Amino acid sequence: MIPQAPFGRTGHQSRRLIFGAAALSRASEADADRALELVTRHQLDHLDTAASYGDSELRLAPWLAGNGRDRFFLATKTGERTYRAAADQIRRSLARLGVDHVDLLQLHNLVDAAEWEIAMGPDGALRAAVEARDAGLVRFIGVTGHGTTAPAQHQRSLERFPFDSVLFPYNWTQLRDPAYAAAADALLALCAERGVAVQTIKSITLGPWEGERPADAATWYEPLREQSDIDLAVRWVLGRPGIFLNTASDIGLLAKQLDAAARGGTRPSDAEMDALLESRGMTPLFV
């Protein structure tokens, strides 16, 4: 059984593996059903989607209706930066999901400095999120980010507004960058101090695609594929107490990530992770 932990100060106990519903963005109905059966079997109770994830919200809607909406901590995201566009997208997401509220609404990939100023300004997306919370359409508000600046930008966001959660890349290869590691550690310390939930992504990254990305690729990076490699990568992330791991967008690798988290084990040593890096030729996704 995948263990649970408090999701920050929200009062919800979430499985430490969160279903990244980006995996449903291009999935057929049959593939989506198989993925959601795995979610059910492993008793995942936290689902993370986004308005920009293709058909993901639509794929979740009938499954939520059939399995009991209130059994799940449901999160979505808006990538809009202005008030009106974000407010419209929030309501559209609720309609697509077939629900009257979500538990967590996140400002999606808010790392660009100019976009940050718009979103956090008086006529920005944050205002729409707060109004949605006040109206009972969302319960909590978070912020997500990709790239090397995400941890530092999240610290800046937390100084401006008491976000309930953050999400950023966290894996062995990325954390070998001293500047990124220092920013991540500072963010983690701030989140622990303030009761902010920490979600992590890109746990099973092998590196950027070499050459042109395959047309059928489910992830925009090349993932690890062997179960033993995924075991090490997942155990390393979950070896950091209190943080959560959002599963990758490759639906074919979902079972391996779930199996790794369910079996658990001690956190791999630095030597073990360096050996994995060297044997597989792992490289940072963000530089």
Give the positions of each predicted feature:
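Beta/alpha (TIM)-barrel catalytic core signal, keyed to glycine-rich beta->alpha loops juxtaposed to Asp/Glu
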Residues: 55, 110-287
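Active-site groove signature of glycoside hydrolases
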Residues: 94-117
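Conserved, mostly hydrophobic/aromatic
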Residues: 7, 19, 39, 47, ...
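Active-site mouth loops of central-metabolism enzymes
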Residues: 17-30, 75-85, 114-118, 145-149, ...
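A short, structured active-site edge motif that brings together acidic residues
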Residues: 70-82, 104-108, 168-170
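N-terminal binding-site loop/beta-alpha segment at the start of enzyme catalytic domains
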Residues: 1-72, 128
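Acidic (Asp/Glu)-rich catalytic clusters
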Residues: 8-11, 40-41, 61-71, 91-100, ...
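Short, acidic/polar
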Residues: 26-39, 83-98, 148-158, 228-233
